[in-house]
Amino acid sequence: PKQVYGHGFLLNRGQKESKSLGNVTDPNVLAEQFGVDALRYFLMREIAFGQDGSYSAEAIVTRANAELANSFGNLAQRTLSMIAKNLDGVLGEYRPEGDDKALLTTVQDACREAFPEQFEKLAFSVGIDAWMKAVYACNQYVDEQAPWALKKTDPERMRTVLQTLFIVLRDLAIAIQPVIPEKSGHLLTMLGIAEDARTYEDMADEGWYGALIATGYRVEPPTPLFPRLEMPETAEAS
């Protein structure tokens, strides 16, 4: 072979797993406890490829809740809920302003450039970090624009803000598919993105939004993407 990948050790609370220590964990059990996507995200986010890495139930729950549930999942939930409730699910023609264009650029740079470039280098944790910073930027934009307040003071501006968030969610979901394929696929379905329009090449299609609204697509009230994880009883007892 021209290239051989060397994986580091996966440590259980900082210790190598062995039968003599009685700390060997079945990965299938972890997947059942936390979900495959959350487990994949933790391992790729937390551990630099090729290096040793440590895991614990507490670490998985903390990372998944902080970044998937509270940040990415909450962003999707708030955005789609407000569109369904305040716009009756109808998106309409998009006319972005300065702050909106700035967020679009931030997310596009992360999802279309930084993330795939780092994955090409096998720097998975670095790529996910770039993606996560884009998620944080989106949540900061929500807090600054306060669409719930704009509903009373400037409904048209509220619409633009929600449209912007809808658009960036599509890039975020497409980009993170290699890490959390099930959940990102579910989000793309809620966004009305066809299964044959979810590749990295599709992100560059600037006409997708206009084509979507031309179909009369309406955003439905969303189902939670990442319910908060709880500590398994077995882990709490150990």
What residue ranges belong to the model's regions?
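Conserved, charged catalytic cores of large soluble enzymes
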Residues: 76-115, 135, 139-154
